[in-house]
């Protein structure tokens, strides 16, 4: 009844507009001054104009009448079938394009002004060191520095330590890559297990010995294979401080390409394992090998309750500058932080590497002589041709003096008289002889030094935390507090160069196929975690937990660990040997399939009308998977739904916490299909043929695209029936432009295709928000015009190719060393274009030799319709030392500034620096990059991590793939020749600035920037598409299904449910508690936010968790540290929580 009223009102409104238009026109003619001058006689031209306009009005009235009739017919049919929400009804407008009537519902809830204050900033003190400013001010001149080639000569007076002894901590460590030259398992078998076995026996020989370990993935594998006796010994070594687990993540993650979901997840997995098995809680971070450092990591470590951290791979010029200004140790603060709550103490290692020659002091020739693995007769030696000597009574005085000189020089670079000296390298201490050589010789040196009061030195073995504790004690502060006089720093340490102009910016793109697969696995893991947690909570509440497959928890655990393993700094980076990449790929695919099973099992339980009838049968799953991959390096193939006389059902999962209106595309085997909602209403669908190439249709496969409104984190149900063409089945129209290429185009009688041989002029596709223009010759995007603006905005896509240098040093897996600026991509033959238009989406597909591009525009209200969906299927397997790039040219006046995200967590402003080579101006882009001026912002959202830059005014440029034939001398020993056909997916969002132009807050704008709410949602729409799960065909009647609405009320727009993750009782079974991890996003209110189709608002960071989940009670709630090791407050009866902008908060939660 309510729907009838709405339609009647809508139709009446259209009729009124038409009549009023006619009245105005007649009125204008009546008051025409020319008419009065002519004594009331109409000129013939006026009469013909009036006649034309009356005819147009009659046509419009007729169209409106037709629309209203169709709506009435639809309403009658709908109300005859069922009650429920109205369907979207598209119609043709006078100019032949499609339009969709707006839904009779609020399209936007306003944002509270208080929630806009955060992005304006201006609070708190500015840090002394802002990395953007440091980079602008540094000359990057690479002056020869003597024995410390990238530094300077260091001098001291022997009296410098008369008042306070130099305290030296030598920290033995072994850096174990979970895959690089060898696979994870091969490293474990051949090296890592021997390191850890020797550690247990060798540390127990002398309580003064210490050892540092970081990678829990290896440690957990070893733990599973050792005796109870050895486990007890390990616990004792941890308890007495001889063995320290630093950071405690599953791996030492890459900080450029990894998404913050995965960074948090691998940290939780490691910390939970340590707590459960060792009772250990990490205190200090240790990141010696990631290729550049993100400011997201110090935030995560601080929120996990770590107090200190160490980093190593920072641009050599920055290291030199910080060494000269005694700034190598600092409080690292987040850019938005106004009260120092995010501060963490950070130590930056000053020299070239973390190996022994570069850690005792500035002279590697001397330091190498104190790496006792290199004693004569061993397998490795010192490149400086002076070998180590075993320490004896006869030489200890000379050798100790030589080493002390290095210690003293190194200590002059720091503000305290406490010195850190790491002692280790990759896979060190794998043989008992090395343990003996290092520990015996160093102990003799320490004993000698410590026996001489005149040296004013105390040297000993130590752990990283012992070093930090001694520093805090010396400076008179509590652990983690800011020592007096130490600087505060904000910003990040990208991009990294280790020497000359060798910038490690290639790995931002290397092996993009696996960077994409990583994010697919991540989205599936989050979706599976949430659905499993909800299904288990409902099953337990209903007393049905015994029937539910709790064993799925083992699959979740394995997937967590697979995703964690792939965050390793030689995995997601694309910098491992080919065989190791295959091993990672096989693991990723296995976990992806497992997660689809977990999702299917949870969705099955949650959509059943009668859950008492649920039974788990692994042999015959209730739901099919949405897609499948024939191998780890193949693109997915979507499941085709076979229609016959009986209805088929489809369950659609929305992994977003917000309700979404999206076009869901299904593949079916018949063009004659009717789609019904859960309530039995027919839904309008756009039907298209399915193409296998530019001109070939796939026989008997059709794409059905239906707009569906899905509940947040919920499950929708659709019914498919075979049907003759009805009013709800709307065909796409297709044009193919051959551009003179001799090709035959597939044809089907049911789907006419218009073929244009040549001479195509520019053309456009459009929706309610914009008109998008393309070149008729190239098929590439040219411009965008918003419907409410006269002016077109330049938005030109160009493909480019980079070569590599002809000199000895060439690009490889790590390095980007281009031979010159990029050259335009020149195709061997003109492209074939295919334009598809229909009621719910229109798209332009362009086929070139090395890529094919599909740019799609959704004709929907809200988030989906406000950006361009772009995908590029890239195949450069015939390239030799070339890289393919996409450049976007705009008329935005960006003035050399652009913005890239760090780990999908925060935005970092960047400045194009002309003094640096081209490759230095590239940065990681895991999620988005944007340019802006005082009027507009253009954001490129990405579904996979790639390298990005802005090399010219108004430009954004992204490297899509790279094929390189040689090693770049960083240890890998291979080029990048295993390229795959890769699909890179993007969203292009153009926004208009409505308030607060960047100049108003210029200082603040330099150091911080935030996406809009629309941009945040667009990013999530791209990275978490709906999952389409067909109900498997079975004998007999299908059980009744219902949609699943888990949230009783919408989450605030700026809240992101990062994860709802069951905690382990053990590796294979869940506990009763789960971890709820929420992130409140910072956003810029100054970009247009009217009628954008959000069904949410903001709430000043407040959320009532107790009433959030429909049908479930929160029976226990406790705020904890990020990884749940530390309770932050007692469990409370109140379930109301509050988050500050940008903060991630974790809660121990019990649902029942």
Swiss-Prot record:
**MF GO annotations:** carbohydrate binding; hydrolase activity, hydrolyzing N-glycosyl compounds; mannosidase activity; mannosyl-oligosaccharide 1,3-1,6-alpha-mannosidase activity; metal ion binding
Task: Tell me which cofactor or cofactors this protein depends on.
Answer: Zn(2+)
Q: Which residues are glycosylated?
A: 225, 305
Subcellular localization is given as: Golgi apparatus membrane
Please indicate the ranges of residues that lie on the Cytoplasmic side.
Answer: 1-5
Return one Gene Ontology term, BP aspect. mannose metabolic process
List the keywords (alphabetical). Coiled coil, Disulfide bond, Glycoprotein, Glycosidase, Golgi apparatus, Hydrolase, Membrane, Metal-binding, Signal-anchor, Transmembrane, Transmembrane helix, Zinc
Q: Which residues lie on this side of the membrane: Lumenal?
A: 27-796
**EC class of this enzyme?**
hydrolase
- Which residues does the annotation say bind Zn(2+)? 175, 177, 289, 569
Classification via SUPFAM superfamilies: Families 57/38 glycoside transferase middle domain, Galactose mutarotase-like, Glycoside hydrolase/deacetylase
Transmembrane domains' residue ranges: 6-26
Which Pfam family is one of this chain's hits?
A: Glyco_hydro_38C
Q: Where is the active site?
A: 289 (nucleophile)
User: What binding details are noted for the cofactor?
Assistant: Binds 1 zinc ion per subunit.
Topology class, membrane: Single-pass type II membrane protein
Its Enzyme Commission number(s) read 3.2.1.114
Entry similarity comment: Belongs to the glycosyl hydrolase 38 family.
Query: Which proteins does it associate with, and in what oligomeric form?
Result: Homodimer; disulfide-linked. Interacts with MGAT4D.
Its recorded name reads Alpha-mannosidase 2x
From which lineage does this chain's organism come? Eukaryota, Metazoa, Chordata, Craniata, Vertebrata
Gene behind this chain?
Man2a2
């Amino acid at each position: 009844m309510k729907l009838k009223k709405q339609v009647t009102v809508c139709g009446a409104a259209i009729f009124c507009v038409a009549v009023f238009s006619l009245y105005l026109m007649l009125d204008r003619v009546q008051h025409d001054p020319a008419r009065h001058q002519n004594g009331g006689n109409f000129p013939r031209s006026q009469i013909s104009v009036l006649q034309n306009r009356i005819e147009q009005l009659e046509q419009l009235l007729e169209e409106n009448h037709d629309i209203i009739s169709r709506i009435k017919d639809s309403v009658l049919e709908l109300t005859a079938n069922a009650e429920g929400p109205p369907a979207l009804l598209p119609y043709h407008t006078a100019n032949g394009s499609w339009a969709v009537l707006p839904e009779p519902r609020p399209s936007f809830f306003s944002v509270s002004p208080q929630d806009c204050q955060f992005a304006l900033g201006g609070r708190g003190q500015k840090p002394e060191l802002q990395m953007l400013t440091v980079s602008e001010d540094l000359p990057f001149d690479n002056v020869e520095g003597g024995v410390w080639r990238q530094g300077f000569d260091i001098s001291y007076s022997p009296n410098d330590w008369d008042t306070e002894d130099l305290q030296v901590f030598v920290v033995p460590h072994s850096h174990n890559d979970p895959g690089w030259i060898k696979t994870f398992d091969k490293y474990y078998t051949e090296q890592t297990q021997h390191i850890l076995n020797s550690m247990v026996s060798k540390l127990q020989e002398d309580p003064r010995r210490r050892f540092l370990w970081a990678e829990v993935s290896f440690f957990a594998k070893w733990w599973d294979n050792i005796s109870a006796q050895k486990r007890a010994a390990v616990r004792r070594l941890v308890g007495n401080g001889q063995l320290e687990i630093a950071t405690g993540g599953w791996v030492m993650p890459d900080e450029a390409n990894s998404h913050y979901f995965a960074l948090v997840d691998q940290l939780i997995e490691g910390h939970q394992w340590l707590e459960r098995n060792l009772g250990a809680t990490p205190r200090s971070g240790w990141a010696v090998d990631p290729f550049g450092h993100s400011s997201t990591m110090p935030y995560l470590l601080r929120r996990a309750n770590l107090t200190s951290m160490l980093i190593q791979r920072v641009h050599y010029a920055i290291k030199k500058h910080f060494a000269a200004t005694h700034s190598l140790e600092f409080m690292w603060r987040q850019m938005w932080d106004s009260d120092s709550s995010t501060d963490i103490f950070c130590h930056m290692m000053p020299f070239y590497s973390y190996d022994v020659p570069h850690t005792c002091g500035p002279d590697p020739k001397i330091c190498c002589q104190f790496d006792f693995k290199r004693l004569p007769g061993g397998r490795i030696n010192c490149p400086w041709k002076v070998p180590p000597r075993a320490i004896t009574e006869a030489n200890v005085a000379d050798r100790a003096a030589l080493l002390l000189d290095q210690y003293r020089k190194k200590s002059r670079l720091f503000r305290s008289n406490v010195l850190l000296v790491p002692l280790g390298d990759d896979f060190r201490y794998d043989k008992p002889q090395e343990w003996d050589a290092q520990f015996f010789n160093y102990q003799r040196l320490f004993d000698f030094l410590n026996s001489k009061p005149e040296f004013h030195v105390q040297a000993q073995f130590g752990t990283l935390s012992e070093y930090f504790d001694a520093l805090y004690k010396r400076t008179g502060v509590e652990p983690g507090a800011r020592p007096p006089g130490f600087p505060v720093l904000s910003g990040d340490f990208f991009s990294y160069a280790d020497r000359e102009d060798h910038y490690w910016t290639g790995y931002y793109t290397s092996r993009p196929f696996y960077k994409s697969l990583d994010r697919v696995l991540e989205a599936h893991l989050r979706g599976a975690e949430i659905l499993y947690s909800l299904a288990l909570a409902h099953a337990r509440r209903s007393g049905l937990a015994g029937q539910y497959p709790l064993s799925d928890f083992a699959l979740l655990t394995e997937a967590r660990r697979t995703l964690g393993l792939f965050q390793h700094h030689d995995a997601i980076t694309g910098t491992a040997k080919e065989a190791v990449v295959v091993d990672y790929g096989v693991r990723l695919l296995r976990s992806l399939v497992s997660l689809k099973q977990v999702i299917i099992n949870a969705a099955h339980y949650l959509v059943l009308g009668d859950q008492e009838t649920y039974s788990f049968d692994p042999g015959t799953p209730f739901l099919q998977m949405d897609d499948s991959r024939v191998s780890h390096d193949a693109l997915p193939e979507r499941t085709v739904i076979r229609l016959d006389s009986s209805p088929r059902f489809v369950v659609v999962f929305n992994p977003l916490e917000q309700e979404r209106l999206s076009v869901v595309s299904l593949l079916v085997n018949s063009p004659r299909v009717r789609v019904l909602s859960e309530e039995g209403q027919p839904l309008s669908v756009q039907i298209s043929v399915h193409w296998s190439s530019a001109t070939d249709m796939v026989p008997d496969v059709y794409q059905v695209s239906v707009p569906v409104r899905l509940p947040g984190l919920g499950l929708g149900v659709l019914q498919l029936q075979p049907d003759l063409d009805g009013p709800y089945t709307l065909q796409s129209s297709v044009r193919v432009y051959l551009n003179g290429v001799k090709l035959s185009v597939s044809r089907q009688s049911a789907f006419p295709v218009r073929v244009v041989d040549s001479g195509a002029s520019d053309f456009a596709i459009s929706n309610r928000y914009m008109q998008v223009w393309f070149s008729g010759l190239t098929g590439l995007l040219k411009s965008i015009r918003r419907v409410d603006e006269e002016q077109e905005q330049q938005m030109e896509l160009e493909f480019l190719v980079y070569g590599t240098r002809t000199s000895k040093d060439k690009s490889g897996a790590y390095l980007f060393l281009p031979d010159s600026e990029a050259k335009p991509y020149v195709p061997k033959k003109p492209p074939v274009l295919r334009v598809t238009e229909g009621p719910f989406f229109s798209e332009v597909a362009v086929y070139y030799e090395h890529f094919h591009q599909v740019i799609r525009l959704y004709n929907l209200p809200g988030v989906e319709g406000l950006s361009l969906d772009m995908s590029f299927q890239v195949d450069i397997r015939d390239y030799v030392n070339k890289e393919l790039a996409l450049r976007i040219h705009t008329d935005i006046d960006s003035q050399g500034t652009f913005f890239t995200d760090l780990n999908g967590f925060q935005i970092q402003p960047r400045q194009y620096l002309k003094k640096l080579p081209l490759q230095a101006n590239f940065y990681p882009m895991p999620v988005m990059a944007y340019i802006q001026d005082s009027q507009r912002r253009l954001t490129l959202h990405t579904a996979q991590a790639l390298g990005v830059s802005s090399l010219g005014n108004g430009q954004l440029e992204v490297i899509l793939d790279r094929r390189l034939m040689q090693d770049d001398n960083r240890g890998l020993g291979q080029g990048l020749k295993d390229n795959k056909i890769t699909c890179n997916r993007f969203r292009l969002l153009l926004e208009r600035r409505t308030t607060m132009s960047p100049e108003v807050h210029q200082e603040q704008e330099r150091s911080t920037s935030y996406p809009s709410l629309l941009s945040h949602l667009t990013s999530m729409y791209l990275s978490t598409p709906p999952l389409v799960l067909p109900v498997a065909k079975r004998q007999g009647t299908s059980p009744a299904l219902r949609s699943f609405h888990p949230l009783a009320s919408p989450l605030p727009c700026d809240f992101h449910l990062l994860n709802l993750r069951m905690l382990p009782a053990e590796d294979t079974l869940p506990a009763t508690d789960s971890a709820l991890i929420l992130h409140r996003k910072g956003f810029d209110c100054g970009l247009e936010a009217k009628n954008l189709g959000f069904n949410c608002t903001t709430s000043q960071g407040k959320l009532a968790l107790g009433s959030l989940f429909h049908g479930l009670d929160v029976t226990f709630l406790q705020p904890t540290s990020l990884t749940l090791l530390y309770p932050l407050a007692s469990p409370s009866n109140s379930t109301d929580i509050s988050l500050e902008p940008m903060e991630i908060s974790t809660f121990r939660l019990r649902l029942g």
